[in-house]
């Protein structure tokens, strides 16, 4: 039976905090046990209640702290609590620093409930994978990575010429290919589309940093692009 994960929201705008709380509580496996509006309030709360928490939803723009100071303070003192950023901060430096701070996810406001629930589902799968185990296999870690890729693909607004159903087929084909990867021709045979169509989807996945390509040279020296999931 899946446990009920307890959540703290750190958000200075009480209206946004209320919306986030409702969205989280609408998920069957999560429950918000408190909200904090300042860094000082959050650290005081965590000093007493961190052991009861599983996850923090954290904004970057908190009035009494600068930048990601609160993230680092939480990470230094309360390492057993996972952190998911939910913020309007889009700066690359901010995102990179947050990732170095060990966050489990980074969501940009405004966040739709469906997207948040997808990320929470992925979090549940990760927690259940680790559970009380002392060791995991490489295959299990690969499956976890594939879940994360599917979540990201499912939530991204798609440009013209990219169909979600076809995109999912392409991602599934790359998953099955694993470390061997696929050429556009091989992908076309697997999903029943033209080579140019499959190449377009492969290049889209590269553009969104969910896939990569390597150039190989065949027996006659012709370059061949082979695609892999990141």
From Swiss-Prot:
Keywords of the record: Activator, Cytoplasm, DNA-binding, Phosphoprotein, Transcription, Transcription regulation, Two-component regulatory system
Gene3D superfamilies in alphabetical order: 3.40.50.2300
MF GO annotations: DNA binding; DNA-binding transcription factor activity; phosphorelay response regulator activity
Domain Response regulatory: 6-124
InterPro entries to which the protein is assigned, alphabetical: 2C-system_Tx_regulators (IPR051271), CheY-like_superfamily (IPR011006), DpiA-like_HTH (IPR048714), Sig_transdc_resp-reg_cit/mal (IPR024187), Sig_transdc_resp-reg_receiver (IPR001789)
A single GO cellular-component term on record: cytoplasm
Record's comment on post-translational modification: Phosphorylated by CitS.
SUPFAM superfamilies: CheY-like (SSF52172)
Residue positions where 4-aspartylphosphate is found in the record: 59
Segments of the chain annotated as binding DNA: 184-203
Entry protein name: Transcriptional regulatory protein CitT
């Amino acid at each position: 039976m899946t446990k009920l994960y307890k959540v703290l929201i750190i958000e200075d705008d009480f209206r946004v905090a209320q919306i986030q709380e409702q969205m989280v509580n609408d998920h069957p496996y999560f429950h918000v046990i408190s909200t904090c509006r300042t860094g000082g309030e959050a650290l005081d709360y965590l000093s007493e209640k961190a052991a009861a928490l599983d996850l923090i939803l954290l904004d970057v723009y908190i009035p009494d702290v600068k930048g990601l100071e609160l993230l680092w303070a939480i990470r230094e003192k309360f390492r057993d609590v996972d952190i998911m950023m939910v913020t309007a901060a889009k700066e690359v430096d901010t995102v990179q620093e947050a990732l170095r701070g060990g966050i489990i996810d980074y969501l940009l406001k405004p966040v739709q409930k469906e997207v948040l629930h997808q990320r929470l589902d992925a979090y549940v799968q990760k927690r259940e994978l680790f559970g009380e185990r002392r060791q995991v296999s490489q295959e299990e870690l690969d499956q976890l990575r594939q879940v994360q890729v599917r979540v990201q693909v499912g939530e991204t607004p798609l440009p013209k010429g990219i169909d979600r159903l076809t995109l999912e087929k392409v991602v599934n084909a790359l998953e099955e290919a694993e470390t061997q990867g696929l050429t556009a021709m091989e992908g076309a045979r697997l999903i029943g589309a033209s080579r140019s169509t499959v190449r377009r989807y492969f290049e889209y996945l590269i553009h969104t940093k969910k896939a990569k390509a390597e150039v190989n040279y065949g027996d006659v020296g012709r370059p061949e692009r082979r695609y892999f999931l990141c």
